[in-house]
Amino acid sequence: MRKYTVIASILLSFLSVLSGGHHESKAFPVVQQELFQTPHYIPLLENPPQIDVKAEMRSNLMIEAQVRDNSYQAFSAFLFYKQSNELGYKMVPMDPTPGAVRKFLAQIPKRLIWNSELEYYIVMSNGKQRVESETKKLKLEGYQADLAHIPELLITELAVDTKNIGRADGYEFIEIFNTTDRTIDFKDYHIRYRYPKEGPDSDLIWRPDERILIPSGETFVVWLKPAGHPELTSADFNRYYQTQLKEGKNLAVIDETEGMANTRPRAVVISTNTGKDISVAHYRKHALRRLSSVLYKYPLNGTAELLNISIGEKNPSPGTVLQAQVPDQKRKIKLDKEKPVIEDLTDRKPVRPAESIELRADIRDRSLVKTVAFYYRTDENKPFKRILAEKDRNDNLFHYIVYSPELIGKDQLEYYVAAGDGINEARTPVKMIDIKQTSKAHGLRMNIENRDTLSGTQFLKATTEGRADSIKLWIDGKKQVTEPAMEKEVYFAFDTRKTNLYFKNAVTMEGKVLKVFDDTTNKYRTYSVPLPETLLRKGKQLQRITIRSGSKVSPFDTAENRDDFLVKNARLVLSDGTVIRDQRVSPEKELFIGDNQRSNKSWQFQFNLPDGLFTSQLLEWDTSKLSEGAHHIQASDGKENVSLVVRVDNSGPHIEPNITEGQTYKGNLILQADMYDKWSRIEEAEASLDGESITLPYHTSSSDLLPGKHSLKVTATDLAGNKTVIERIFKTEREHPDQPEVIDSEADTHKAKLSVRVKDPTNDAMDVGFYRGFQYTARNHVKIFKHASLTEPPKSFVPERETPFTNKELERVSAADGKTVSTENKELFPYHRFEVTVDPSIDENDLAESVWKGSSLPGRKVTMYAWNYRTNEWQPVDSFVAKDDKPFTLKASVIAADFVRESKMNVIVQDEIPPAKDMYTFVWMSDTQYYAESYPHIFDKQTEWIKDNQKQLNIKYVFHTGDIVDDSADIRQWKNADRSMSVLDKSGIPYGVLAGNHDVGHKDGSYRAFGKYFGSDRFDKKFHYGGSYKNNRGHYDLISSNGNDYIMLYMGWGITDEDIAWMNQVLKKHPDRMAILAFHEYLLVSGNRSPIGEKIFKEIVKPNPNVVMVLSGHYHSAMRKTDELDDDGDGKPDRLVHQMLADYQGGPEGGQGYLRLLQFDQANDMVHVSTYSPYVKDKNYYDTDTYGNKDEFSLSLDLKPRIKKVETDYFECNVYTNEELGKREQVKSGDTAEFRWDHLEPQSVYYWYIIVEDSFNGKTKSPIWKFKTKKETYRPAPDQFDFRHVSNP
């Protein structure tokens, strides 16, 4: 009621202003409008004060007015404007300018401006007297059209709500205007009636029967005569509108139409026969006045979208246009003498009857190709069929499929292609495609061949030219009981359209599903279904076949929403091409199947097959009851005999792996298997090792495999379809040597003896290599800094305002002794950075290992990052989730080439301490497809509102759960979506998107267009973007707010097992973050999960205890479902998982901009969910009186802030160089290996390590050890002695 109260208030204010004087002549002139009687007269003020007016064109036209006289206190103001003298003034209420006195502001939305000149004046009132400004004219830039880009044909007027004839509008019409300097033949065009929500593929096509010629600069009217009224003539039309239009000259009639909707948004389009929109006229529901018309003007922006300049202001005037509707000059058409060039791309190789033929052509012309037609026939004695073809939006070619039912029983197909540009026409020569029909056999025959290999249940069939009951059949001399059958396959064919992807629509017979058709089909497509021979029985009065509308669960499901589609031309097609129909149904009658009001959930067809068609005898033969090997089959009809020998093979191939069950293997290992089949050949083979697929032979080693048991599984399938699976369990020992034990590092002044004891778990001899190393701690060559950053990790290498550790702090972290340094922050993410200065001799291939020891709080994840100089980013190298507050270690190794520059290496260890403030908000958008297609201003309104309310609502994040656009092949829609979502980019508001089914190729699932506009490169520089999967097919965002840490995990349309594995991997890496999962499809309109939703729930939601919420769209509804999950197996629920569906695209204007707000209330551990439309400024799409809290409710969620810290106990950096000092070979297990390191500097610290390897690829690296050489003792040289002080003996 709030909306209508506001409207009524404005209207009454408007009427009070208009209630006196000459102003009625300027006011909104509506023909036949009822006059309002107002009790109060507000006179015009004598000697009125001056009104100052200022106009400015921004995103909208802004007009501000102020009364100069301080004594006149206006409380209301209205702007009156017009854009053409042929149309009256329109009124816009003016709002008081905030913070100003006697100032008012009006906005005219840019979309309502269609002329370069605008005339306006302003009326103000204080309730007793009113003042009026002078009339002004305003020149507007950018509203002049380029004549060369104006469409050649315009829709200038629609009359969609006229006097009824019976129950239908009797005199609806479409007025067309020719803008060119030549007469246009309408044969290359047609009219399309469009449902904006469903797109062009669902258009109704209207083509007048008679030829239409539209002279230059003149109009032509098309009358949509209602169905069931053949008595109406053009005289009735002229009488109703008081016109003198002549049928065939400037009036055409389209009979038997359902007309145009009066109360729903629709579009009328003039299109070429190739599908190119020339003019598009939209009208919306509630915008029409009965018995009035809608007027349009040529577009100014070079598109086909006509400008709506008048709704309900004028009475219909078929055949007459206003000057404002059409350009001042005629568009000149250049002389064109070139014919289109046709390249026939049809594959003309012979086809089998069960196959279809696709006719394909590439057609080019300097002018617009307006008509393309395929002509074909399968009988040379009949005329060619003409099929108009539209350009395919995926490959820009022209296609038409001749489906198999038209080819069965035919020998060849003749065809040619014709194309025209409105002036010139080209055509190809007639070409032929052979159809390989099975040659008709004669005499007694069977459906198997001599020496065939058979298995399982076989249908043996014998046929003769005579009576079928004369046929007898024997197997191994034993007579068999048979039944009559048809020799060749029978096909059930039907045409269907408007089916939707993944709905399990089906053809069934006697309760058996013969075919599921679950593809998206907007245009009629023919399906052909072979019928099981066991279901077609002689003597049955009728063969009954059912087409069922399915849900996404099953063709027989009764609980969920069913698909709605149309079917026509259902028939049986016999092998000779004979067509048998259900006599109750006309072939061209469209049958509605589904669960809407005018549909049947299923339709059963009945066909009569004459007994004369059953010319065979059939045996259902179970070969598994016989021995394997050769068997003799005989058939006789009393005149002829047929004798065959077949092989029965019901056992699988023989497989012999080279692995012995239970044996232990060492060293290199080649896995392979011998395979053969006694009765036929091996058709398919595959193998796996420990569940992972491998290709035999497979090379591995005991050092590559974990110690313990392993499984080799080999599967082979033979020609008869028999399968054998063999599994061998084998073992490998612990192959790698034990960690070596340092014995001594006896250091002298210039040398040191290095001694280690080595052991191997299987007593193998080992080679021991001695290598140089380096080690750095807080005591030497390591500087440590502390700080807190806005993100985790920091975006820059060295953030500003870092603080170095004091000497006292450095001493505390120089040993792993429990003495720590802790850094905390109330707002940002604290970290410690370690800058290590390494020895200049370190090579780029050397390995640098960082070891950090410290502690955190239970449940917290602490991450170590190393700075990658090549990619200029902090790269995560190790992490740990603390189970308690006890110390733990982070350790990681990196290659010096990417992580050391100018002898410097940098590592940080980071955790977070977020703030605890007020409530924060996440916004959730979904299924914006119709905004991108038809209502981009609504899309803009959504994101602009999010930007404008970011601070007020404390908006931290925005979800989009897919169907960003309606047609992934339409670049215009992607550009609209890109522009709208860029508002969030420019405002710095974190958001994530995924691809819905409309964002990918409907048939091939291609993500190309999605990746171009919303791929990973759009997001990878944003602080919240955690990681991408297949160019943003999936991704995750990391968001923290008010002490709550989230991971937002997305996966787009067409989820596979590989996708699920990736999602589980990501969730396991972030167990300390609450996970909100986003998919396009998950919940159904019933509140249950869809099949893919159930799979996600079982394989992702349940195993990951941090998942708390799942969001989805796709289905036109709003639902929620909460599950209690027991994570620790004690029988008590440990968490709630809230699953929600929100998709409003089924509403007016594609959903009218409704979006979800999730407000997180930490004080009460609740998430308050509400629904709001910035476009209509209204809460709750679903009325609360009818639907209750469907759109507004609260969910329970633990939102207590979790305190975190980074606390360091010890840090060291170990560098393992490739500098080999020496080597000892074939050292026995348990023995000591020694090496003397010479040429050392005195009183110096040296680091070293060893690598131990055995001959079976076992390899172990030691820790880094150190020693210090002795101080050199000074001894004078002989020539330095003073012999004068040496006494003789």
From Swiss-Prot:
Gene3D superfamilies: 3.60.21.10. The keyword Transferase does not apply. Residues 141-277 form the LTD domain. Pfam families: Metallophos. Residues 1-23 form the signal peptide. It comes from the Bacteria. Keywords: Signal. InterPro entries: Calcineurin-like_PHP_ApaH, Lamin_tail_dom, Lamin_tail_dom_sf, Metallo-depent_PP-like, Pesterase_YvnB, STPP_CPPED1. GO terms for molecular function: hydrolase activity. This is Uncharacterized protein YvnB. The gene is yvnB.
